[in-house]
Amino acid sequence: MPPPASSMGFSDLLNPQNPESTPSTPASKSSAPSTPSTEQSNSNMASSVSLLPPLMKGARPANEEPRQDLPRPYKCPLCDRAFHRLEHQTRHIRTHTGEKPHACQFPGCTKRFSRSDELTRHSRIHNNPNSRRNNKAQHLAAAAAAAAANQDNALASNAASMMPPPSKPITRSAPVSQVGSPDISPPHSFSNYAGHMRSNLGSYARNSDRASSGMDINLLATAASQVERDEHYGFHNGPRGHHIFGSRHHNNNRLPSLSAYAISQNMSRSYSHDEDDMYSHRVKRSRPNSPNSTAPSSPTFSHDSLSPTPDHTPLATPAHSPRLRPLGTSELQLPSIRHLSLHHTPALAPMEPQPEGPNYYSPTQPHVGPSISDIMSKPDGTQRKLPVPQVPKVAVQDLLSPGFTSVSSSASNSVAGGDLADRF
């Protein structure tokens, strides 16, 4: 019974479209009671014809009703559509997000697709040898590969050509970098540059003028601190007849804030050599006659923070260098701070010695500071009671000196060394 119903429904649909079939319909009806076999053949033909249009159109009306009843658990979170399968939902979501995970694997092709069937259809373009697009794509891919290879070669050649030049300025421009960044320069850079500086002071002065404006504070601070250190040397060596250094001792408290800043910036300097001390005095002798006297003095100050015998005195904590810390406190005349600093670690030992005469320092004595036996051998009882290096700053000799503190002279003596005083 269902086939006749479907055939009748199909005939009803065809009646308005085909008016010529109207006379044939009654003829078939009139012949139906006479020939039952004809009715069966007509019904079979009608059922077969009814299936042709859906198959040709790609639709399935017979299976569409049960398909609508199937559950659609996979719903799109961005719209109201739902899907029977997860891969269908994933493919649909890519239409919202624009994601294209399927990339063409052909060399030189950068196209991507959101569906795998689109990628398959696109890959046929590359696989077809007779396609014009394939030939064009191959040419473009070859050109892109050649350009990339040329670019890589150019970068490699540029890198190879740029490598040798930095090796030379590293050692020659080290003192300029030490002024701006005191913690970066290697320890051997200044020793290589010191011999070159002796004959090229003018060139260094010109190079220092090219420094960036960010180093102005460091230059001022190092210059002020170097002037103060020269004053200490001049006062200590003044009785020996050197008026060049003794003439500056009246500027004792000049720029204390800059000196404190320079001390904080250069606390981590822990490299020094014997030739550094010799060169520092040459610079100091030429300071009154040099118009750019502050430029050559900056590298010497950055390396005078240790004794001239680095093989015997490697400080474990160069950031807490004792020679630089009490220098600013003694100039600011803060006895309370000096009393508080009596309990520093033994790394502060080099600040303790106080010059009592020309026989205080011997070249063979290690520059670590006086031992306990040296402290106990002091004639003054107050000095024996205070084992910390900064004790001599509040000693009687320090209080008796009106215009200069013994701590500064002791600090300068510990930095320069007794053998340096004997040279004068």
Swiss-Prot record:
Top-level taxonomic group: Eukaryota
Composition skew (Polar residues), residue ranges: 39-50
Residue ranges, annotated region (Disordered): 1-74, 115-134, 161-184, 269-327, 347-386, 403-424
Chief location: nucleus
Entry's Gene Ontology molecular function annotations: RNA polymerase II cis-regulatory region sequence-specific DNA binding; zinc ion binding
Zinc finger (C2H2-type) residue numbers: 74-96, 102-126
Biased composition (Low complexity): 21-38, 288-302, 406-416
Basic and acidic residues: compositionally biased ranges: 62-72
GO biological process terms held by the UniProt record: carbon catabolite repression of transcription from RNA polymerase II promoter by glucose
Keywords, in A-Z order: DNA-binding, Metal-binding, Nucleus, Repeat, Repressor, Transcription, Transcription regulation, Ubl conjugation, Zinc, Zinc-finger
Post-translational modification: Ubiquitinated. Deubiquitinated by creB, probably to control its activity or amount.
One Pfam family linked to the record: zf-C2H2
Location relative to the cell: Nucleus
Entry coiled-coil feature ranges: none
Gene Ontology cellular component terms for the protein in this record: cytoplasm; nucleus
Family: Belongs to the creA/MIG C2H2-type zinc-finger protein family.
Subunit structure: Interacts with creB.
Cross-referenced PANTHER family: REGULATORY PROTEIN MIG1-RELATED (PTHR47428:SF1)
Function: Transcription regulator component of the regulatory network controlling carbon source utilization through ubiquitination and deubiquitination involving creA, creB, creC, creD and acrB. Represses the transcription of the alcR, alcA and aldA genes by binding to a GC-rich region in their promoter. Also plays a role in response to carbon starvation and the control of extracellular proteases activity.
Protein name (record): Probable DNA-binding protein creA
Species annotation: Aspergillus fumigatus (strain CBS 144.89 / FGSC A1163 / CEA10)
